[in-house]
Amino acid sequence: MYCRLLLKLILRDKAVWICTLVLAAAFFVPIAFNSPIYGPFFMKQGMQGFVDAFNTRAPQASGTDLSPEQQDDAELARYANAALAAQTDAAFLDSAESYYALMDEGFQSGSIVGDRETNDAELAYCRALSSSGITDIPASANDLPFLSFLPYAIAAAPSFLPFIPFLLSSILLLGATRPATLAAKAPAPKFRRLIQIVFSIIVAGTAMLLAGLAPGSIYALALNGFGQIGYPIAFFHNGALTTTTAGNVFTTILLALLAGGTLISVCSVVLSTATRRVFAGPLASALLVAAPAFPLLSDSALGHNAALELLPLAVFSPIEATGYVGCFPTEFIGSGSGGASMLAVALVYVAVLFAVGAVVTRSPKQAGPAKKHHGLELLDASVGYGSTTILSIGSLFLSPGTAAGLVAPNGSGKTTLLEALSGQFPTRIRSGSLAADGISQRQSAEFAELVYLSSSGGADLYPTLSALEHLAFVREAWKSAADIDSLCSSLGISPYLDKPTRKLSTGMKQQVKLAMAIATDCPYLILDEPLNGLDPGKRKTSCDAMRSEVARGRSVLISSHLLDDLADLTNSFYFIEAGTLVEKIKSSSQTLKQEYLDTYEGGE
């Protein structure tokens, strides 16, 4: 249910679709421009360069007049010319293998100096192809089968690109679950909620990435087939020649992308939860993803810095630990990690971060049994935000079946007090205690089942979801038995239940939020400016609905500047005077408006 809501939010966000289109375009670039496969391209380029150099310096003498070195050069030139003139891949492969084998002899004897590692990788590639009986060598991106397209597309794109979907999903879903949002108010253990958010980010990020890869993958599959699992790949890794297959690389790359996405998701959610800063986690994850591109973290730096080797950087540039078809790299960022160790390091970090998440979301145990009396009670408290304390409260008690009003000018701290009472903002209460029916607000999941705050802003509503979807989520999350149809009919919101809330007027949104509060079945409702933006008829409808809930035994605390309506609804009031909360009982000799004017000397 919770994950379903988050995935709906992702699916309906335009940024997600834009990101997917950008990914699809970026991964399709090699095919669109028919980029050469650098292995065969550089093999032929190297051979052609050798032939040109040989022809320039070749002596006119022949046969026995040539020195052994000149004879070797002539033999190399013959193999190179044969490879360059080959009409089939099999003929090219046969001549190329002989060319690189002779080059290898020259390296061993010392008669040839240069890039031996690349020559060794090219020779291993040719021999592996010959021994496997595979003679098809892709020359350009349009020749790649499905199995080879994924690694090549990942290699051709910037290393951070495949992980953008996970970063974007993290930002969107952490924003959708920040304090005061509907998802944040849902009663659930904090660690379970953390896991659900992480899972939703992984699912959304993976779906975006696969959708971005789909056009190129489908094109490669349709044009060149699935490919051969045993197609050889050769490259130097950590100073040693490594040979593997296209099937192994494909699997490792997929696992690395998933491991990297999981690491981003967990890091983003845990750090944002621990710091209570929505963007702290995604920012840290973005730095990790971008790190392989930093000069400081180059292969030479990693080779001399044990601390940097402990970072899970290789998983964010997996192609450099796996190689890919036709490419013979000899240097790597994170060269100390092979495919298996790269994945292992990433998963260790995931496990550690989950452990940190379990610690930071742990709720303290209730100190002794819950008190037997009923009511919402804030005692001996100071309330504030940031580094500022704005209210001192001796006692605020809301007993079952009562309605109380909160009255004060703008800027006095009404919203801060209501947020403190909701339990959703634990840092709002600097000292003192808050409990509902004896359940401390520190027991966040149990407390959320009892107390619901309907905020004055738009945080309660998601613009892309309909009113009905909000109400359905509320009913399921709070395990409510509320009759949604009857509730909507009584408030007059049935005609626009299927509209996205961004298309509703301010008054309509107010009524939807009131319906959501009622639908929770929470015994204590805290309503911040629930009557703002309503015409007289709708105000009466909303007041009747609140009065009906009080008659059913629910308690309501209402903040409003509409004093006449507030006076009709409530039988006690709380005023904020000079930073202190003062309770005043309803008087028959003085109206609430007169009381307000006397208290604030002409203030609102």
Give the ranges of each region predicted by the language model:
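Conserved ABC transporter NBD signature motif
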Residues: 430-447, 583
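Q-loop/switch helix immediately C-terminal to the Walker
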Residues: 453, 463-477
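Terminal transmembrane helical anchor/hairpin motif
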Residues: 36-49, 135-144, 225-248, 282, ...
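Conserved ABC ATPase "signature" region
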Residues: 472, 481-497
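Secretory targeting signals
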Residues: 31-39, 135-171, 198-269, 273
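Helix-to-loop junction immediately C-terminal to a conserved catalytic motif
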Residues: 422
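The feature captures the beta-strand-to-loop junction immediately N-terminal to the Walker
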Residues: 407-409
